[in-house]
UniProtKB/Swiss-Prot annotation:
It comes from Macaca fascicularis (Crab-eating macaque). Its EC number is 1.15.1.1. Binds 1 Mn(2+) ion per subunit. Destroys superoxide anion radicals which are normally produced within the cells and which are toxic to biological systems. Transmembrane segments: none annotated. The modification N6-succinyllysine is found at K68, K75, K122, K130. Residues 1-24 form a transit peptide. SUPFAM superfamilies: Fe,Mn superoxide dismutase (SOD), C-terminal domain (SSF54719), Fe,Mn superoxide dismutase (SOD), N-terminal domain (SSF46609). This is Superoxide dismutase [Mn], mitochondrial.
Length: 222
């Protein structure tokens, strides 16, 4: 099962990307809203396919890959262990990223964050609008498939924007703790926005769950 902790997600799932021994299989998390709840910004067909097909595939493939990895460990087959690393990273990252993504969205979302998160955004980016522009640009600018992220640099105590290719998990790739992720794989928007990724980015700001992002930020500051 994916840890429900909002801080240190990469560390919580780290065992899934290279361990062994007994474990529970990963499972597809339920959405905290109906498939059609984010309309008109993200339609129900996209949400259903994205969650029940794409995310489910990452979960299933992660479980299969981990079983193979355990077998390779038991046999002492280092070559097989190395060969399985890309699949662990891809499917484990897909599971981590999407589990964050669903909670980052809400039919009651949009607007601006409040309190300490808003103050931190103003401190590190100048204003909320400048932050939106920078994260939008980073997300639109991803070549091919990937993610745009707002992350927290715990060592510096600062918010940072980053982009990761494919399903590379933010924390495992950059060390930043994920607060807000924007999926820019085509399966996240193509059925509604076709090849116009900027329109999808413009729409998704209307359903950002700032309460969830703030919760993640406050947890990581402790």
């Amino acid at each position: 099962m994916l840890s429900r902790a909002v801080c240190g997600t990469g560390r919580q799932l780290a065992p899934a990307l290279g361990y062994l021994g007994s474990r529970q299989k990963h499972s597809l998390p339920d959405l905290p809203y109906d498939y059609g709840a984010l309309e008109p910004h993200i339609n129900a067909q996209i949400m259903q396919l994205h969650h029940s097909k794409h995310h489910a595939a990452y979960v299933n493939n992660l479980n299969v890959t981990e079983e193979k990895y355990q077998e390779a460990l038991a046999k002492g087959d280092v070559t097989a262990q190395i060969a399985l690393q890309p699949a662990l990273k891809f499917n484990g990252g897909g599971h981590i990223n999407h589990s964050i993504f669903w909670t980052n969205l809400s039919p009651n979302g949009g607007g601006e964050p409040k309190g300490e998160l808003l103050e931190a955004i103003k401190r590190d980016f100048g204003s909320f609008e400048k932050f939106k522009e920078k994260l939008t640009a980073a997300s639109v600018g991803v070549q091919g498939s990937g993610w745009g992220w707002l992350g927290f640099n715990k060592e510096r105590g600062q918010l940072q924007i980053a982009a990761c290719p494919n399903q590379d998990p933010l924390q495992g790739t950059t060390g930043l703790i994920p607060l807000l992720g924007i999926d820019v794989w085509e399966h996240a928007y193509y059925l509604q926005y076709k090849n116009v990724r900027p329109d999808y980015l413009k729409a998704i700001w209307n359903v950002i769950n700032w309460e969830n992002v703030t919760e993640r930020y406050m947890a990581c500051k402790k």
